[in-house]
Amino acid sequence: VNLQEEIKRIKQIMGLLSEEEQKSYESKPIILIGPQGTGKSTTAEALAKKLDIPLIPTDMLMVDEKYEELCKNEPGVEVKITRDKGLNYSSNKEYEFCVMNKIFDDYSNQKVVLDVGGSHANWDDNYSKRMQELFNSTPNIFIFNVSNDEDETYEFLKKRREGRGEKISPENEDKFRNIISDLNNFYRGTQKISIIDKDKKSKTTDELVDEIITKLT
């Protein structure tokens, strides 16, 4: 057995894609975005591992010192990050917009998995068109939901989160509903990934990963 065949065999055992399969989609980011509770981040991690490409969690980069330094002095940006006694972070949309642009500057022509927080679904008129252009620069953007029925999605995810011991305040309930609605509207026309099957049962992480891989272009 030659070395290349052995490497291919080991990759198959590990559940990784072959080089031929790797080349079958564009050198662009794969974006996963969705509200909390959809299993998006778990799926993103598993997808990156299976494709053997880097995982880039955008929420973490919002508090990364590199992006803070790049954006903190930009016009209109407000950001405060303290790291001495745990992490405290507050910012405005101008900062988030700046960081997302810098992330795309860094990764727009790379095969990476971008795990994008659901809070990045809402952008006011000053930024919405430019954000859509940014996200549409890759053909592989996947929105995690339960169904196109926003109430069904909300109730399913609320029940799942409460089942994990989370307490959702009335204020956060409204915010959560808005994120679900914003995702359905802001990213209209992109590929949707339902986290439940036809029998209304939750799909496994492996099932979600395989579904995404079959839809890569």
Predicted features along the sequence, with ranges:
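P-loop (Walker A) phosphate-binding loop of NTP-binding proteins
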Residues: P35
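ATP-dependent small-molecule kinase phosphotransfer cores
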Residues: M60-Y127
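Conserved lysine of the Walker
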Residues: K40
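NTP-dependent small-molecule kinase module
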Residues: K23-Y25, A46, K50, Q110-K111, ...
